[in-house]
Amino acid sequence: EYELPVQSHLSENDAEIEWVRALHPDCAQYWETYAKFGLWKRGTIMAHCVHSDARERAAMRSAGVWVAHSPDSNTNLYSGVAPVRKMLSEGLSVALASDVAGGAKLSMLHAAAEAIRASKLRYYYSGKRPDEAYLTVPEAFYLATSAGQQYFGAGPGFCVGDSLHAIVLDDSVLPPSRPLAPAERLERLIYADDSRTIRAVISEGRRLI
């Protein structure tokens, strides 16, 4: 009635998939249970999608459904590793999530590091197939920041006319090392996940911290 956005789970683990199949035997796949009730639409967010096959992913792309990738939760609950590389290659909208229940931390830097680690494991156990290539540091950082921002209609990065949403990070508090290139500094910030590096948080142009 109110066209509100919907957020739920999809194909998180084997037991959940079997449970949904038992509840809705008329649906061939998990995603069809949402479609049956009019919830499979643009703006819907589905968390996990660990076991979403090609057909389910295609249904997500065509409907404009987003993926909330929660690697830390998926590891903690031994659900598996989501096919993030395939999702990105197929044009799905993906952003990182912490999962307040199954995840160990709310930090998006931690989520980015976990996403990289999980994707490397998937890449290795796939036999290092190119279509399962692991996430790079810039890709994971993008998924933790600008990717989610686009869900709310803002352009990626800093665009003229958009409200400013930013976090100011200062890596001088981290242990000294040899001189680092900008890409190496970003990598260290992500893997260190040290709250001391956060100097300011700005939302809609207003400084919160």
Report each predicted region and the residues it spans.
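Histidine/acidic residue-rich metal-binding segments in metalloenzymes
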Residues: 1-66, 78-94, 156
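Short, acidic/turn-prone active-site loops that include or flank metal/cofactor-
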Residues: 12, 71-75, 100-102
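A generic structural signal for nonpolar/aromatic side chains embedded in well-ordered alpha-helices
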Residues: 34, 60, 87, 112, ...
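His/Asp/Glu-enriched, well-ordered alpha-helical/loop segment
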Residues: 36-39, 43, 85-175
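Thr-Gly-centered strand-to-loop micro-motif
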Residues: 46-48, 69-72, 96-99, 204
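Short glycine-rich, flexible loops that bind phosphorylated cofactors or substrates
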Residues: 54, 75-76, 103, 176
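Short, charged, surface-exposed secondary-structure boundary motifs
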Residues: 76-81, 105-107
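C-terminal cap of metal-dependent C-N hydrolases
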Residues: 163-209
